[in-house]
Amino acid sequence: MKPDAHQVKQFLLNLQDTICQQLTAVDGAEFVEDSWQREAGGGGRSRVLRNGGVFEQAGVNFSHVHGEAMPASATAHRPELAGRSFEAMGVSLVVHPHNPYVPTSHANVRFFIAEKPGAEPVWWFGGGFDLTPFYGFEEDAIHWHRTARDLCLPFGEDVYPRYKKWCDDYFYLKHRNEQRGIGGLFVDDLNTPDFDHCFAFMQAVGKGYTDAYLPIVERRKAMAYGERERNFQLYRRGRYVEFNLVWDRGTLFGLQTGGRTESILMSMPPLVRWEYDYQPKDGSPEAALSEFIKVRDWV
């Protein structure tokens, strides 16, 4: 089937609505919407929930941008895209909870198509979700990865292990020699066997995110915490900032294409701290995190 960008766009708009409704149901606070237009073509809807009952900040962004030429970040990766017009659309979200025992989560689903007269379109889907705990709970990690595995199974036995490994490899801070979190799923350049199959998988990922995340939020949101845990959460949020600004392809693509900076940087935590040569106390829960986030098979 020929790629249907309109169908994808409608799914993404509905997905943004659904996820915002689900997060509001857990938190009680409402999202504020900011609709925007991109001068070079396209626009989007940025939605932010701030200082809620559970979430310090949650951002759920829909964007649909188009242009006559590809940016350097994309043509370096895919030289066959040079000289083509493009459309890129997606939903991207990051949730930063108040409680340090509730992990930060990120999800993204996206579609890209590049066309020129007289040639077949070049298109692909991408996306996934990943979890960044500050304090590790095995039952949470197992639930997260089991949900990811189960949504992948209808698409093939090898899908979950392949996209889990890709996620582990992608969300890695080379300059720190550590994972960003415990991973999940990550896929890019997905265009086989055909459009319908790939679109169905992207829909499963988009819908599976809240199935994976919200039970963990419910389990941890009322746990008591103090200044020690909060300080550690703010320190570890620094890793999130470092990854997004140094390594994340999506952030670089957005900034290089003249994307909307406020929306691109909506993933940043509202508060964060760095501390020179921080070393957690031996045997402390904080010290245990470095071992917990090492790559392993959770299911």
Curated annotation (Swiss-Prot):
UniProt pathway: Porphyrin-containing compound metabolism; protoporphyrin-IX biosynthesis; protoporphyrinogen-IX from coproporphyrinogen-III (O2 route): step 1/1
The protein's name: Oxygen-dependent coproporphyrinogen-III oxidase
Coiled-coil spans in chain: none
Assembly description: Homodimer.
Taxonomy of the source species: Bacteria, Pseudomonadati, Pseudomonadota, Gammaproteobacteria, Enterobacterales
Site label Important for dimerization, positions: H175
Family, similarity comment: Belongs to the aerobic coproporphyrinogen-III oxidase family.
GO biological process: protoporphyrinogen IX biosynthetic process
Region (Important for dimerization): 240-275
Annotated InterPro entries: Coprogen_oxidase_aer (IPR001260), Coprogen_oxidase_aer_sf (IPR036406)
Compartments, as annotated in UniProt: Cytoplasm
GO MF: coproporphyrinogen oxidase activity; manganese ion binding; protein homodimerization activity
Name of one Pfam family that matches: Coprogen_oxidas
Cofactor: Mn(2+)
Annotated positions binding substrate: S92, N108, V109, R110, G258, G259, R260
